[in-house]
Amino acid sequence: MHDPLSPRRLARLWLLPAALTMSAAASAHIVFEQKQAPAGSYYKGTLMVGHGCNGSATRAITVTIPEGVQGAHPQPKAGWQLEVKRASLAKPVQSHGKLMTDDVRTLRWFGGTLADAHFDEFVMLMKLPEQGGKLYFPVLQECENGTTEWTQVPADGQTMRDLKSPAAELEVLAPAGHMQGHSH
């Protein structure tokens, strides 16, 4: 008689969600693992890179930090080097009791190799704006043979699915009881 809950069948059922997740990550664009975060929070952004450029290995990832995001810090990766570039802010901001006139605008991991058939994560910590809305993080993926610019942002009437090379999107959730753009 066939046992529907045999150990072998249970193991296959247990592994199915993991296999589906890996398959989705491998075929996806560069996206944040957590696609939403509260306004004004410190957010650990994990960018998932699911493939290289047209079959070649990834050699560098550069992320542009959008205006309104403060104090971005990259997490080091074994075998990769880091480059952090700052730029002047359009409007100075207060941060930890200091007036900041510049902030981090790009994070770059380079010098490592991520095979096209593998996936990996590139992690950063940042403070999100106090207001809700969508933020777009353009990513330049440099590979052994070519580059991919994940920089497209949806126009009115478009969705991210309409884009060939979308920037990584993060939805910043407005505080409960506050309308977007309204502050006290």
Sequence positions of predicted segments:
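N-terminal edge beta-strand
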Residues: 27-49
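Low-complexity, intrinsically disordered segments enriched in Ser/Thr together with acidic residues
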Residues: 107-133
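Extracellular adhesion/glycan-binding regions together with long Ser/Thr-
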Residues: 88-116
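Extracytoplasmic/periplasmic copper-protein system
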Residues: 39, 142-184
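Bacterial N-terminal signal peptides that target proteins for export
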Residues: 2-14
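N-terminal signal peptide c-region/cleavage motif recognized by signal peptidases
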Residues: 23-25
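Low-complexity, serine/threonine/proline/glycine-rich extracellular segments that form mucin-like
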Residues: 42-80
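Short, solvent-exposed loop/turn segments enriched in Ser/Thr/Gly
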Residues: 40-45, 120, 134-136
